[in-house]
A protein has these predicted regions:
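Beta-strand/loop-dominated core regions that host nucleotide or nucleotide-derived cofactor-binding catalytic loops
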Residues: 514-530, 546-600
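Short, basic/aromatic beta-hairpin or loop at an interaction surface
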Residues: 47, 504-523
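Short, well-ordered loop/turn sites that connect or cap secondary structure elements
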Residues: 31, 534-536
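Short, charged beta-turn/beta-strand-edge "cap" motif at the junction between a beta-strand
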Residues: 77-79, 99-100, 509, 545-550
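Residues forming the flavin
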Residues: 2-27, 32-455, 459, 470, ...
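Short, flexible N-terminal segments of the mature chain
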Residues: 537-547
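Acidic (E/D-rich), amphipathic helical modules within compact regulatory domains
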Residues: 455-458, 462, 466-512
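Well-ordered secondary-structure scaffolds
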Residues: 441, 445, 449-450, 454-459, ...
Length: 703
């Protein structure tokens, strides 16, 4: 069986790994101890985890974050979410074919077992950037705090990010890679004995007696906090289209989990729908992992993410199709191709513009929804509850850090442990970091063709200025000295060519042009984060401008070849400075190296698989767009009634994925949303084995 592990990565450490054996449908396979079952299956090129009882549709990964139930498998006789269940030596794993059988339990319930109860001044749910930052402020104030997270390491989505972060160096570790920021925050927190962290601990409900129920190591525990902070992050949104639940269609965050956290080569060729930062960054991460990106498709006329992120992809040879959408994912058992089409002014696909890409994976990156059910229920029960990060408002992780700090200080102040005023600068910086990117502007290249000088290829105001902090001569500033101002250099004759600005830039948008040795053919230093292969000294490279257009060499000079590769592994790990000699008239245009071939598509496909009404809305119960539309047109205005008619939203995930789409369907049908009754949310918010609540002991004495 083919093994799909990432064995070499330009940023992440890929060292030797211990292996364990497990079985999948009676076949012996190998995995890493402690990795999630889903990742072990993907690493063994298995993406179909079972078949749905309603229509025998193949089931596989979608969220990789415990938010849906599509990755269900049977592990040692018990149905579990494969993305949340660690692999063990000798584990027997089976696909779920239809309705999972009820596991045999020989041990009787412990009628007298005691539920552990714990009272704490502060409970924080979620150890991502917001939760960690809040805990740090509470730790500094000496507030006894319990921080819990359902993963086996702190950091939240920071763990998945290999790119360098934006913001400022002093406030949000700008220029440092996301996973390293998570480690920094976690290490800082260990200095405070008053903060206790429980990992592998899942909050499952908030109750009317102001108790938060959690499951830790198979045991049910009740926690009664004076103050509750919900920092649970976000979950990925989905799109309705035929084939949208085929194995191979999953969220961009799930892809980053597989590729960056678990070092699984989850795909050979992907197509991405969604041109926000999440989708564009996922495309870059794919290329770092050796995965081809066929294209990025965005419904708007312009990408919603930072232009420097989009520019990085286009320079590498990835086409970005704006005003396009996905029409269908095609395949019998898994994704074999994806059909896209151009959108008209009414957001309808234009007939005849269909284009089909042969890919094995379709990444969905069409936005995020707040994981705020714990916050809303706590408010309903009158708890003193706070909210931070994406659970409060979807924004960048750097903004979540500020949000967490602010809420941490508010909680400390409410407990009388902080008597100062919360700095207004925190709120102001948080708002800046949440702000939308500005409109791209045209900028002229700097004048002069002597000495050595930086060239800034960023044309859009975004909150980012690490280049101003690393210049040894303090020559780099931003317009109006604001974090969103475009950078520029002064007194460039003083530049010594240290290359720090090239290496630190999160957008890889700074080059250095050195005329000192040969003014006619200066040396251009380019940032590069894809490893040394293909850019070794003497390698022939295809250079590109900011828009991804090829910068051709002059016929008299021949090919562009790499002159030298420089690395500062200690200060800027993972970033290479590739030096190439370029004609002076082109030197300030050059910014990238193309590694992918020109776009290849199958052409038009006027008959994509399936009809729009076949799109699955409710993954758990396989409720389709057509069934839900029919009920709405028959007069249904209550989502609870929809559950009774066609089971939409009735599944074990608690409508986490389908709920936003249900509201959109009502809106698309012309129904005023104030006329629609929302579903009633009840505990539990997360699936919990009955044995945990009954005190049933397993074979090894665990709950």
């Amino acid at each position: 069986m083919t093994r799909k592990r990432i064995t070499r990565h330009p940023v992440l450490d890929v060292g030797p790994q211990e292996e364990v054996t497990f079985s999948w449908n009676n076949k012996t396979l190998y995995g890493k101890p402690g990795e999630m079952i889903s990742s072990a299956l993907f690493a063994n090129n298995i993406q179909i985890f079972g078949h749905h009882p309603r229509d025998n549709a193949p089931q596989g990964m979608f969220c990789a974050n415990g938010q849906c139930s599509q990755c269900l498998v049977i592990a040692d006789g018990v149905p579990v979410k494969s993305c949340m269940t660690p692999l063990k030596e000798g584990m027997v794993v089976e696909s779920v074919e239809g309705v999972p059988r009820v596991p045999r339990v020989d041990a009787p319930p412990d009628k007298g077992f005691d539920v552990l109860e714990k009272e704490v001044p502060v409970l924080i749910i979620g150890a991502g950037p917001a939760g960690l930052s809040a805990a740090l402020e509470l730790g500094k104030a000496g507030v006894e705090t319990l921080l819990i997270d359902d993963k086996d390491e702190a950091g939240g989505k920071l763990v998945l990010q290999t790119h360098k972060f934006f913001g400022s160096v002093e406030d949000s570790h700008a220029g440092t890679r996301g996973f390293a920021i998570g480690n920094l925050l976690d290490e800082e927190l260990k200095a405070f004995d008053c903060v206790e962290t429980w990992l592998d601990t899942t909050a499952v409900g908030v109750f009317s007696d102001k108790i938060v129920g959690v499951v830790k190591n198979g045991s049910y525990i009740t926690i009664k906090p004076e103050k509750l902070l919900v920092a649970t992050g976000a979950r990925e949104k989905m799109l309705p289209f035929p084939g949208n639940t085929l194995p191979g269609v999953y969220g961009a965050g799930a892809f980053q989990t597989l590729v960056n956290r678990d070092l699984v080569k989850a795909s050979e060729r992907v197509l991405i729908v969604g041109g926000g930062n999440v989708g564009i960054i996922a495309g870059y991460h794919a290329i770092q992992a050796g995965i081809e990106v066929a294209a990025v498709v965005e419904g708007l006329a312009e990408v919603g993410g930072y232009k420097v992120h989009a520019d990085k992809l286009e320079r590498l040879g990835v086409p970005i199709h704006t005003s396009h959408t996905v029409v269908s994912a095609n395949g019998t058992h898994r994704v074999e191709s994806v059909t896209v089409a151009e959108l008209d002014s009414n957001w309808k696909p234009v007939p005849g513009t269909e284009k089909t890409f042969v890919v094995d994976t379709l990444l969905i990156a069409v936005g995020l929804s707040e994981v705020n059910e714990f916050y809303l229920k706590a408010k309903q029960w009158g708890m003193d509850v706070y909210c931070a990060g994406d659970a409060e408002e979807i924004a960048e992780a750097s903004a979540a850090m500020f949000s967490g700090r602010i809420q941490g200080l508010k909680i400390a102040k409410s407990l009388g442990r902080f008597d100062g005023e919360i700095p207004k600068s925190l709120e102001e910086k948080a708002e800046v970091l949440k702000s939308r990117p500005g409109k791209p502007v045209k900028r002229e290249a700097p004048e002069g063709e002597t000495g050595v000088m930086p060239v800034f290829h960023c044309f859009q105001e975004i909150p980012c200025n690490p280049c101003t902090s690393v210049c040894e001569e303090e020559l780099i500033h931003t317009e109006e000295d604001t974090i969103t101002g475009l950078p520029y250099a002064v007194d460039v004759e003083k530049c010594k060519g240290c290359m720090n600005c090239v290496a630190v830039c999160p957008g890889l948008a700074v080059t250095l042009v050195d005329y000192r040795k040969d003014p006619e053919f200066p040396t251009v230093t380019l940032p590069y984060e894809l490893g040394r292969e293909g850019v070794e000294k003497g390698s022939v490279v295809t250079l590109t401008d900011v828009d991804g257009n090829t910068v051709h060499p002059s016929p008299s000079r021949g090919n562009h070849t790499v002159k030298r590769v420089v690395a500062n592994k200690k200060r800027f790990p993972g970033t290479l400075m590739v030096q190439v000699v370029v004609e002076k008239e082109k030197a300030k245009q050059v910014i990238g190296i193309r590694i992918q071939k020109e776009e290849t598509a199958m052409g038009t496909d006027p008959d994509p698989a399936g009809l729009a009404d076949d799109a699955v809305i409710c993954r758990c119960e396989r409720g389709t767009l057509g069934e839900i539309r029919s009920a709405i047109r028959d007069g249904v205005r209550d989502i609870n009634q929809l559950k009774g008619i066609n089971r939409a939203g009735m599944g074990s995930c608690g409508s986490k994925t389908c709920r936003p789409m249900l509201w959109k369907i009502f809106r698309d049908e012309g129904i005023a949303l104030e006329e629609v009754t929302d579903r009633v949310d009840r505990p539990l918010f997360v699936e919990v084995p009955l044995g945990v609540l009954a005190g049933v002991k397993g074979e090894n004495g665990d709950e």
